[in-house]
Amino acid sequence: MAAVHARIASIFLVFASIMQPASSESGAGVSDALPSALNIAPLAMPDFSFAGYGFGLAPIPTESGKVIDVTHHGVISNDGKDDAKAILKALAAADLVRGLVTIRFPKGRIQIGEIIPVERSDIILDGAGEKDGGTEFYFPRPLKIVDTSDRENELRDYLKREEKFQVEPDQNISFLFSEYSWSGGFILIGPKKSRAASYLAEYDKQDTVLTQAVSGRQFDRQLIVANISRLRVGQIIQLQWSANAGENSSILKSLYGDISGWNEKQTDPKMKLNIGLRHWESAKRPTVAQSTRIIAIKGNTVTLGDPLLHAVSAVQPALLAAWKHLSNVGIQNIRFTFPYSPWFGHHLEQGYNAIYMTGIFDGWARNLVIENADSGILTDNAASLTIANITTTGNHKAHYSVHIGAVHNVLVRDLRIENPVIHPLSVNTRSTRSVYQRATVLCDGIIDQHSGSNHQNLFDQIVMNVKPKKRDDVWSYALWVGGGAPYWKPGHGRMNTHWNIRLNFDADAAKGTTVRVTSGLEGPGAWIVGLHGNRSLEVDYKPDAYVEGTNAAIAAAPSLYDYQLAKRRKRP
């Protein structure tokens, strides 16, 4: 394993220096060749095409099942009165229905003044369209005012104990973080009384162990287990790897590779990579979790719905655990509107959050417009979601647009970000093999790799409008601006991939020159393939990354997700 990591490091260094083609100062060319990144051994690039509903292959359901019309339960659009109680009555009626049920909303403005929990499987919230003349959900007050539940108590305790204060002396800001900065939503989807995210060790409970995993190769779908008596075909389980040996655990080496080579070269201690203690400090909390479906069982060999994130062996153990979740839950064809409100500062959001998707396997959100939110869609503790055709808009500065949190196999497709957002595209703590595909960021585009063992994520065919800065006659743009606390560093694990990203610079900025595209200290093992724009670009990524095809759009495979999905569909 050490030899493999060493070879990986050397390959990254070689290609970082030789694989950037010369280009004209006018910007991008076009490459008709497939990038070499697709064929480099032993670096088997993850197959990202398993992200999304039905492991990327199954279409989102179009059937409605039993339809419940909310107007039959008291919803009256456009009357200026609150409709939350009537919606809750409709949901109570849905709970009496076995099988698929659709909650149907009429055209017009529907006012909602409290949290709407969606706590069952096989349910769709369906409006009459997200455009003008369709269905509009209007939320006049933030969660800070309307949420009187205890759902966020663990997070509130965590913020106080960790002394999570936003401190900006020049703005006279020294305030405790808001619990709604990255959590909570008015449409709250998840199992009843479930824990959306873990913060404090005393809240941790050992998940029910179904069996121990014995062996399996990374990126294979077959896994040998110790006992199959509690397993069945079609079962949703969570495969868990833990760093039980602390900072020397094998799973951390699989996550981050050998970082010693980078660290030995650094004279500035701030530029050294350190693995934070959150990776191993809770014995009941996995370091890496993969929620998946059992497709087949033969003897003690289990076939999973998607490839193993990491190998399983005696030195890198894993277990199969039960996982509380909903399935087949969707929300679609609706516009969400919040009143314009002042921006009080980073981490001080008041909770104008539209949707929080948690504890879901096979779910979706599609055809939504979200205006003036603090966060449009937040996700945690979920897997196999498709979030498609979302537009976030408005003049209010947001924290997140569509956030990829502690989730696995989430596909965010055709996202359009029109509003100012602190973290417009963000893979957060514990996000794995998730994808932003064809997102368009209209202002201040950045990529946030938010620490917390996020790894094997894909930014695919993204278009970003950006404004470079000039200093000492050098133009530069900070594209990779990762957040996260020191105890969750590095910024990301191996194989976060940036594919065919286009940067559009202001018409008069950096004209006739090369722009240096920079990062902070991110994480090891990144892939940056086909970064291009309307200026000549030079990549400066820290630590060393695999960089190929800069200044040339990838014509042969514009979308890596689509390319890999097409190859899967051709397999017997």
Which role does the model predict for each range below?
Residues 8-16:
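Sec-dependent N-terminal signal peptides
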Residues 286-291, 296, 302-317, 321-332, ...:
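Beta-propeller domains
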Residues 115-119, 135-146, 178-180, 185-192, ...:
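Glycine-rich beta-solenoid repeat tracts in large extracellular/virion proteins
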Residues 104, 111, 117, 126, ...:
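Extracellular beta-strand solenoid repeats
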Residues 1-9:
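Bacterial N-terminal signal peptides that target proteins for export
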Residues 439, 460-572:
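Catalytic domains of carbohydrate-active enzymes that cleave complex glycans
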Residues 122, 327-338, 361-372, 383-396, ...:
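Right-handed parallel beta-helix
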Residues 10, 20-106, 111-344, 520-572:
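Extracellular "leader-to-stem" segments immediately downstream of a signal peptide or signal-anchor
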